Amino acid sequence: MAFRDHLGAAETISQPISLIHGMWEYSKASQHPLLVFENIVETPGHKAAVNLLTRERLCAAIGITPEEYIDTLAWAMENPSVPVLVDSNDAECFQNQQDSVDLEAIPIPHHWPQDRGRYSSASVIIAQYDGIRNMSFHRQFLRDKNHTVVRLVPRHLRTMMSTARANGDTVDIAVVNAPDPVVLLAAAMSFDENIDELTIAAALHEKLYNQPLRLTKLPNGLEVPASAEYVFWGKITAENDDEGPYVDITGTLDDVRQEPVLEFDGLVHRDNPIFHALIPGEAEHKTLMGLPRSPTIKDAVSKVCECLDVHMTEGGCGWLAAVVKIRKKHHDDGIKAIEAALAGHRSMKMVTIVDEDIDIADPVRVEWAMVTRWQPDKDTIILSNQKGSSLDPSRYPDGTTSKVGFDATISFDADKSGFMSVQ
């Protein structure tokens, strides 16, 4: 499948729109529906799409219900598959190639006025070094025609880059914009060990579409999804430059940092290409970051009790807070679930545990469970001096934070009839 195959329900905007704040302003004014902008003033011949990957639209796009989502991702993590390789002549992404790289000619947007400039936020980076392949999300500030500055969080790609720099090497990369959503989901997952995320994407592609995931090889040897709208390739250089400010998932401005510079040698795209122009801090951003955390949290909690579902909350920006539904079989299941959930997603700051009768996607019902089933002095865990998230502006100067868990389940030995809602 291809990214564009999932845009059938999009509203097409034919009026001239600027990539400098224009897409963001239009989307905000219309309550962020699924949109395709086909008349971008600065980049004629190129379109842009926003707001595809909300939770509901994503599940509809890949043909599953929200209730099936977590278990489907967990299945793919346990059953990785091997993509198939196709010749570049059969790869849609190679339908057009720029004579010389000009990233300024494609619709990389400047959404928020507070951002440093034009940012590619929905593109994934595929990198390979010393026999290890990694695919992950990292925002990129467009510095000039063939350079971006990438925010590398301290995970596998940053480790790969640091190792290469220590050895006097560079890291070959490919940047992929608008592949099929299953590729984006796999890229958004985080693993403790080095796992080839493209094998997770291949498993999802086979399970959901009954077709193998097709890759094609670039001139620098890297393999990328053949149906992607845009692909550009190059390397992580030894140079650093300023990156940020940037409106992040919390809706607050992230810091200015010295970050690695990417240099690009080639750029290809499909006929009539559609750039995925994710708006930072909105629902699509929170979906891509938060939903892939749910199966890791569920897996961690399932090791200590029966976990039924996990929801990354909107108020927690899809990243810093979750509600976990369990089926309680022992008196301490709620407390164990808190500890396991926080361990399963180390950036999370707050977790609430509820019983199986609570709709965890409804904040009113979760709050109802809190006020009717939770006693603050005995059902609360506070953990101090924990590793914090760089996305949390309240973290301490050394990067640590405290974390909290609420056990809003009915006491195990209580008469449950008095706790059940009749509404």
Go through the PLM ranges and name each one.
Residues 1-246, 251-261, 265-423:
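Extended, highly charged
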